[in-house]
Amino acid sequence: MAKPSYVKFEVPQELAEKALEAVEIARDTGRIRKGTNETTKAVERGQAKLVIIAEDVDPEEIVAHLPPLCEEKEIPYVYVPSKKELGAAAGLEVPAASVAIIEPGKARELVEDIAMKVKELMK
């Protein structure tokens, strides 16, 4: 299946798994924002340290604004294959189209590592 139009670069499986792990750790030891509305607000306010976007969001328009907004605000973002997995990592029983890590907590080094790898992928 073709990637949705809002997916601007290919994310290796290992990096996607690290992003989900970072969400879980930040959920427990820091602060996250769950869902596209909360994520958008966190990006607009410059609070997000890392934005995680699911690749299987339908309709695409729900999250299509996030990559350009993150680029404008210079906030790193990464894709994960499944909104169901992203929701679970965020501690939800429902899928989440996107999540923003506000305070990484004990995931700080992991978030910094992901941000660095994402910069390489975007070149």
UniProtKB/Swiss-Prot annotation:
Q: Which GO terms describe its cellular component?
A: cytoplasm; ribonucleoprotein complex; ribosome
> Which organism does this record belong to?
Thermococcus kodakarensis (strain ATCC BAA-918 / JCM 12380 / KOD1) (Pyrococcus kodakaraensis (strain KOD1))
User: What's an example Gene Ontology biological process for this entry?
Assistant: translation
Disulfide bonding pattern of the chain: none
Q: What family classification does the UniProt entry report for this protein?
A: Belongs to the eukaryotic ribosomal protein eL8 family.
Q: What is this protein called?
A: Large ribosomal subunit protein eL8
Q: Which InterPro entries match?
A: eL8/uL1-like (IPR050257), Ribosomal_eL30-like_sf (IPR029064), Ribosomal_eL8-like_CS (IPR004037), Ribosomal_eL8/eL30/eS12/Gad45 (IPR004038), Ribosomal_eL8/Nhp2 (IPR018492), Ribosomal_eL8_arc (IPR022481)
Q: Which residues form the signal peptide?
A: none
**What exactly does this protein do?**
Multifunctional RNA-binding protein that recognizes the K-turn motif in ribosomal RNA, the RNA component of RNase P, box H/ACA, box C/D and box C'/D' sRNAs.
Write down the Pfam families for this protein, in alphabetical order.
Ribosomal_L7Ae
User: What Gene Ontology molecular function terms does this protein carry?
Assistant: ribonuclease P activity; rRNA binding; structural constituent of ribosome
Q: Which UniProt keywords apply?
A: Cytoplasm, Ribonucleoprotein, Ribosomal protein, RNA-binding, rRNA-binding, tRNA processing
